[in-house]
From Swiss-Prot:
It catalyses: a beta-lactam + H2O = a substituted beta-amino acid. It comes from Acinetobacter baumannii. It is found in: Periplasm. Carboxylated on the epsilon-amino group of a lysine, with the resulting carbamate functional group serving as a general base. Probably N-carboxylated at Lys-82 at neutral pH in vivo and undergoes complete N-decarboxylation, at pH 4.1, in vitro. One of its GO terms (biological process) is response to antibiotic. PANTHER family: BETA-LACTAMASE YBXI-RELATED, PEPTIDOGLYCAN D,D-TRANSPEPTIDASE. Class D beta-lactamase which confers resistance to the beta-lactam antibiotics, including ampicillin, and carbapenems such as imipenem and meropenem. Acts via hydrolysis of the beta-lactam ring. Has penicillin-, cephalosporin- and carbapenem-hydrolyzing activities, but lacks ceftazidime-hydrolyzing activity. Inhibited by the desmethyl carbapenem, MA-1-206, via a covalent binding to Ser-79. Induction: Expression may be regulated by promoter elements associated with upstream insertion elements, such as ISAba1 or ISAba10. Keywords: Antibiotic resistance, Hydrolase, Periplasm, Plasmid, Signal. It is an enzyme of class 3 (hydrolase). This is Beta-lactamase OXA-23.
Length: 273
């Protein structure tokens, strides 16, 4: 099976701080470097959690945090898969950016989800039911074909089309996530430019002082230990793209904002924003 992106990292990377090369099908290999930033290590320690922040600039990938081995460990993508779900759905004309997904009055996990919304609004609210509906429209066969075509993570979706990204079997490493989102940021994924532009517009989180921050959160609550994500990119004032994937162990009592707090502090520490 051809993968659009795959990576191989030797264990010594996390022990010695050396650099290695990993292969991207149809791409120039990226250089992976263990970052040396004790302050970011301490940020994760202070939150009593284990985590890694993967940063990609051009073809160089740097790893920061207090659990760098997580960078090449597979985890369920949780709601970060909404990015690919939207790309597949729009590309295959299963929806469009103007469609209103109707709420039928059923109880949902969060009251913020209990309303009609577009795909873009559902992306910002991380409304699982809307993206489950989209996945069902796409269907198991087409979804499997598309996930394999893109080579996202292990590309395994199992037999249930509306929860494989929440509980498995789909899994992806933080390095693979940062590669995926970097290609999206540069409009280099094998989808139409229009579809990629539409999805990128859904992901804008913040804009200030000439910087734009795009991203998607994820929180896998139904697995043990729980996993948190925040994956996206910074568009700097000069147009340069810096992609990131934050991955950490979560606990039920943690505030959802902890991921954004860790990310923003780390990006400032690295002078990315």
């Amino acid at each position: 099976m051809n993968k659009y992106f795959t990576c191989y990292v030797v264990a010594s990377l996390f022990l010695s701080g050396c650099t290695v090369q990993h292969n991207l099908i149809n791409e120039t290999p990226s250089q992976i470097v263990q970052g040396h930033n004790q302050v970011i290590h301490q940020y994760f320690d202070e939150k009593n959690t284990s985590g890694v922040l993967v940063i990609q600039t051009d073809k160089k990938i740097n790893l920061y945090g207090n659990a760098l081995s997580r960078a090449n460990t597979e985890y369920v993508p949780a709601s970060t898969f909404k990015m690919l779900n939207a790309l597949i759905g729009l590309e295959n004309q299963k929806t469009d950016i103007n469609e209103i997904f109707k709420w039928k009055g059923e109880k949902r996990s969060f009251t913020a989800w209990e309303k009609d919304m577009t795909l873009g609004e559902a992306m910002k609210l991380s409304a699982v039911p809307v993206y489950q509906e989209l996945a069902r429209r796409i269907g198991l066969d087409l979804m499997q074909k598309e996930v394999k075509r893109i080579g996202f993570g292990n590309a395994e979706i199992g037999q249930q089309v509306d929860n494989f990204w929440l509980v498995g079997p789909l899994k992806v490493t933080p390095i693979q996530e940062v590669e995926f989102v970097s290609q999206l940021a540069h409009t280099q994924l094998p989808f139409s430019e229009k579809v990629q532009a539409n999805v990128k517009n859904m992901l804008l989180l913040e804009e200030s002082n000439g910087y734009k921050i795009f991203g998607k959160t994820g929180w896998a609550m139904d697995i043990k230990p729980q996993v948190g994500w925040l994956t996206g990119w910074v568009e700097q004032p000069d147009g340069k793209i810096v992609a990131f994937a934050l991955n950490m162990e979560m606990r039920s009592e943690m505030p959802a904002s902890i991921r954004n707090e860790l990310l923003m502090k780390s990006l400032k520490q690295l002078n990315i924003i």
